[in-house]
Amino acid sequence: MPTDASDVPLDASPGDRIAIAVTRFGEAEVADRAAALLAGHNEGEEFLLWVGGRHAQGILDGAPPLYWPEVWGARTLLYAWDDSVASTLRAGLSNRAWRVREMCCRVVAARELAFGAELVALLADETARVRANAARALGFVGDFEQALAVKALLKDPDIDVRRQAGAALKLLAVRLARPID
């Protein structure tokens, strides 16, 4: 994916940037390189700019990267997908950084991937945003037994987790065509 970094629309939305990258380089290549970022690999400065935009420029200018390249790799999979990256996304659900786990939950929901067991484990995550997004994703991909695990989150101390659990249960009841008792 060689390109001139000045060609990257740094201030465009992530979806717009990735759409342009897909047009230029192909969806499979963008998804593959995004998965490599998610797995902790270096995909070069230009690709980091495509997925991270202006914030990535800060890292290239010396700010600590922390977990951001992995988050951007996962987020890119919302916009560019290839089935070959599913196992990397599954592994991302157990990443040590909560923001990575949260974004991977979002991708699982968007791509409707059958990672229910991994999502159920995240219902007990120490970070409320991860629990909320795991519950939300289970609304899209969970089965009846997993719905019962989501139901327990209706008593979570965090209101956003409770809201997402309630919404997921409604979706599950419709998807599964049965009440969740």
Q: What positions do the PLM features span?
A:
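Short inter-helical turns and helix N-cap capping residues of alpha-solenoid HEAT/ARM repeat scaffolds
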Residues: P65-L66, R96-A97, E126-T127, P157-D158
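Amphipathic alpha-helical scaffolding segments comprising HEAT/armadillo-like alpha-solenoid repeats
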Residues: H41-D61, A80-S94, E112-A124, D143-K155, ...
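N-terminal alpha-helical scaffold/docking segments in eukaryotic complex subunits
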Residues: M1-Y67, K170, I180-D181
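Structural detector for internal amphipathic alpha-helices that build alpha-solenoid repeat scaffolds
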Residues: D4-V8, I20, R33-G40, Y67-D82, ...
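TPR/TPR-like (Sel1-like) alpha-helical repeat modules
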Residues: K151-D160, K170
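Residue-level detector of alpha-helix boundaries and kinks
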Residues: T3, G15, A19, G58, ...
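Hydrophobic, well-structured mid-protein blocks that either form specific transmembrane helices
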Residues: T88-V107
